[in-house]
Structures are given as structure tokens and as C-alpha cells.
């Protein structure tokens, strides 16, 4: 693949390699997928989970699990791009977290706040579907998953039976507390064996969890040679890191001066702290001659979508954001 010119060809190579290795190890319970950022892991995971459903007579449910709500939102948007024209599919996909309205079956867009013409029986069914996770495809965070697995309250146990014969995709596994990695892989392997669960664990920086467990249950790496992708020029040379400013403090005025020197460009400034982002946004908004936008963790889902859609058509814009933009 050294002479590949388009990144999509490289993504397709990985897509097919992982599918091939999955089919050759279809009886395994744990699968690892480690690939560079931007290599199409999400689309690959969609395919792998669907392949597991096709090859099984009893797997009927998929859980896509992420460490942050923003990733849930991002991957739901990806599904809408793929299946958006197929309402019969979208109606079976539900986001289960603390910020998304309860799912109304047989509709991908309607929620309780847009339509009040439901009888009390409808509300009861909608609530029961949510409590018992009665959806073929669930997108959620690890809080929902681990609460269902280990929670002792009545509400936690409602959806427990849905884990049986399911496919679970765990994304960005490195985001979890590394002190818990050993216990996590031990419990995941035990659950996979006892409840017949297929688990795909993926990340761009996947730790070797097999070193932390004495459970000898077979785990399969879906990429034969990770270096083939990580060291390929399409991924390895995308970013040039500049450390010139690392050893000194940069003030708001200096940062503003540097940005204003680059006219007719689309500029992103990312801050760690929300307060810093808001302070700089207020400062540069007074002097910039081009549109300036702000995205932080306080921005609503719809507001983020509107801003991103807005700036996609701009030739010159300054976007001030926190890490939520990633």
C-alpha cells in the first residue's frame, strides 16, 4: 500500500482486512481494533457489528458505547448520513443518555417535545422502552453500560437481559481510568463468556489489555500489522508539531496579533478551559474583520450543528472552541 494516492483506498484496505479477520475468528468473543485517527474506525465498527449479526442466529442487538456524549452525538450524525433516507432503519436506532429525549418507536425525528398527541399508554410504552433498552441499536456512554452491568438498583437491572447475545462496541477505551483497565477486561471477558456477548474494543491508542488479565479466553486483533497503517505517509505525516512557543507564556494580545496577520483563512483556536475560550472570543470579536464563532461545552447540540454548518461555507472565519470541537 506504499503507492496509495487516496486515503479512502487505505481506509478500504483496513475495512476489508478487519472483516476478513473477523470472519476467520467468528467464534471468538473479544476483538481489538487499533487504527489511526481518521482511518474510518467508526464505519469499520458499523460493518463489523453488522457482520456479527449476520453470522449469528441469535445476536439481535448492538450497543455502541463511548466515553463522552459528544462522541455519541458525532456517531449518531454518521449514522444519519449513512441511513438517513431509510426511516425503517433510523427508527430502530436510539440514543440513550441524559441529554437526549426519549425515543418514540417508528420515528427517527419525533420526540415528546414536538408532538403532544400521545395517550397515556403511549407515554408508558415509551418509558418502558427506555428503561428496558428495547431498541435494536443503542448509542450511549459507558455510564449506561457499566451501570447496567454492575448497578444494584432496580432501575439498573431493567436492561440487564438485553446484554445477552448482543454485540458491544467500546470506542476510545484509553479514556477510561487506567487503574481500572485490569478489572475492566477481566469483567468484560467474563460477561462475554457467560452472556454470549461479542465485544469489539477499539481506539487509535489501544493499550494491550491482555497483559492485565489471567483470563485465557481468546482475543483477536483485527489488524495484522498496525505499523502498516500508523507509519503510512497518509497518517504518519499529517501533522507537524511545533514546540517553539512551548517554553514561554503567550498572552491574549500576542495571540490576537498573530491570528490577525493571517487574513482570508479559516482559523481554529482551541483552549483547554472554557473561561479562556470565552475571554479570547470576547477579545478578538472586537478587532476581527471576519466572522468569529464560539463553541464550548455549554453550547447546545443544535447550536454546535448550526455553527459548523454555517462555517463550512465560509472562506474566512475564526472559530474559538474548547476540546468539545474534537
Q: Can you say where each PLM-predicted feature lies in the sequence?
A:
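Walker A/P-loop
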Residues: 27-49
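Conserved strand-helix element at the start of the C-terminal RecA-like helicase core
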Residues: 61-64, 68-72, 258-285
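Inter-Walker segment of RecA-like/P-loop motor cores
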Residues: 86-150
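Conserved helicase motor
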Residues: 94-106, 272-275, 292-306, 321-326
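Interdomain hinge/linker at the junction between the two RecA-like core domains of SF2 helicases
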Residues: 205-262
Amino acid at each position: 500500500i506504499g503507492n496509495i494516492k487516496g486515503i479512502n483506498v487505505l481506509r478500504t484496505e483496513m475495512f476489508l482486512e478487519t472483516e476478513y479477520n473477523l470472519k476467520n475468528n467468528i467464534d471468538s468473543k473479544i476483538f481489538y481494533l487499533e487504527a489511526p485517527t481518521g482511518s474510518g474506525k467508526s464505519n469499520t465498527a458499523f460493518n463489523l457489528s453488522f457482520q456479527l449479526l449476520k453470522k449469528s442466529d441469535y445476536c439481535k442487538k448492538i450497543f455502541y458505547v463511548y466515553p463522552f456524549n459528544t462522541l455519541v452525538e458525532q456517531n449518531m450524525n454518521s449514522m444519519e448520513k449513512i441511513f438517513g433516507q431509510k426511516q425503517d432503519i433510523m427508527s430502530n436506532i436510539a440514543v440513550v443518555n441524559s441529554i437526549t429525549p426519549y425515543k418514540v418507536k417508528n420515528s427517527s425525528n419525533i420526540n415528546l417535545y414536538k408532538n403532544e398527541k400521545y395517550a397515556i399508554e403511549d407515554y408508558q410504552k415509551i418509558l418502558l422502552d427506555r428503561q428496558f433498552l428495547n431498541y435494536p441499536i443503542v448509542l450511549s456512554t459507558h455510564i449506561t453500560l457499566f451501570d447496567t452491568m454492575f448497578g444494584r438498583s432496580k432501575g439498573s437491572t431493567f436492561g440487564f437481559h438485553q446484554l445477552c447475545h448482543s454485540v458491544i462496541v467500546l470506542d476510545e477505551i484509553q479514556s477510561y481510568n487506567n487503574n481500572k483497565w485490569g478489572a475492566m477486561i477481566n469483567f468484560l471477558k467474563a460477561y462475554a463468556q457467560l452472556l454470549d456477548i461479542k465485544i469489539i474494543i477499539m481506539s487509535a491508542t489501544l493499550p494491550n489489555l491482555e497483559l492485565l488479565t489471567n483470563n485465557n479466553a481468546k482475543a483477536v486483533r483485527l489488524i495484522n500489522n498496525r505499523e502498516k497503517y500508523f507509519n503510512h505517509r497518509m497518517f504518519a505525516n499529517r501533522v507537524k508539531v511545533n514546540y517553539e512557543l512551548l517554553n514561554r507564556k503567550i498572552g491574549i494580545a500576542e495571540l490576537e496579533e498573530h491570528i490577525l496577520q493571517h487574513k482570508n483563512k479559516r482559523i481554529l483556536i482551541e483552549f483547554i478551559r472554557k473561561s479562556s475560550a470565552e475571554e479570547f472570543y470576547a477579545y478578538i470579536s472586537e478587532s476581527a474583520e471576519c466572522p468569529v464563532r464560539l463553541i464550548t461545552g455549554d453550547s447546545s447540540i443544535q447550536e454546535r450543528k448550526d455553527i459548523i454548518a454555517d462555517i463550512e461555507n465560509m472562506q474566512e472565519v475564526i472559530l474559538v472552541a474548547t476540546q468539545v470541537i474534537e
